[in-house]
């Protein structure tokens, strides 16, 4: 599955196409990045929409254990997970500690999925892990499950398809 930058320039901040359609209640939806980061972040859906975005191809969502078809998911638009992490900056004490970092994505319901530094920054997984705020060209609200974490490089997307992403905790694992 290919992710392509939405705007021609990655530094473009002209996203009026998206912000004009947002719900004022989206300001209440907050995603936090915390833990071993230089700059802890608290982001609203509106803040996510203002960042450079990527889109992914539609996919079939299937149950991981039974392979039962759940539904076809239209293309997501959102921010690369790596871009959010890079924006917060990684904090570590010793050289090489970053290679032992994990990123725990946690939903409002407590469902949590991990990523390693190697997955996100040293493999194709990082090129296809997004925090989505739009699906099928329509903005997602909290009622729709926004923000949604999606890992497009996974063989089966369901286990790391997380609705109502609340926080991303960054940790350095002990040797």
Q: Model features per residue range: what roles?
A:
Residues 1-175:
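N-terminal intrinsically disordered, low-complexity segments enriched in P/E/S/T
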């Amino acid at each position: 599955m290919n992710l392509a930058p939405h705007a021609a320039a990655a530094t473009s901040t002209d996203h009026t196409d998206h912000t004009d359609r947002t719900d004022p209640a989206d300001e209440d939806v907050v995603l936090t990045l915390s833990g071993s980061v230089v700059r802890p972040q608290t982001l609203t859906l509106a803040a996510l929409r203002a960042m450079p975005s990527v889109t992914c191809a539609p996919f079939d969502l299937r149950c991981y254990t039974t392979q039962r078809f759940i539904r076809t998911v239209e293309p997501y638009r959102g921010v690369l997970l790596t871009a959010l992490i890079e924006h917060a900056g990684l904090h570590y004490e010793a050289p090489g500690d970053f290679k032992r970092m994990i990123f725990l994505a946690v939903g409002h319901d407590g469902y949590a999925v991990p990523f390693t530094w190697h997955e996100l920054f040293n493999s194709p997984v990082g090129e296809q892990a997004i925090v989505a705020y739009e699906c099928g060209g329509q903005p997602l609200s909290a009622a729709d499950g926004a923000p949604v974490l999606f890992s497009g490089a996974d063989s089966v997307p369901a286990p790391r398809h997380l609705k109502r992403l609340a926080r991303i905790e960054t940790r350095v694992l002990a040797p």
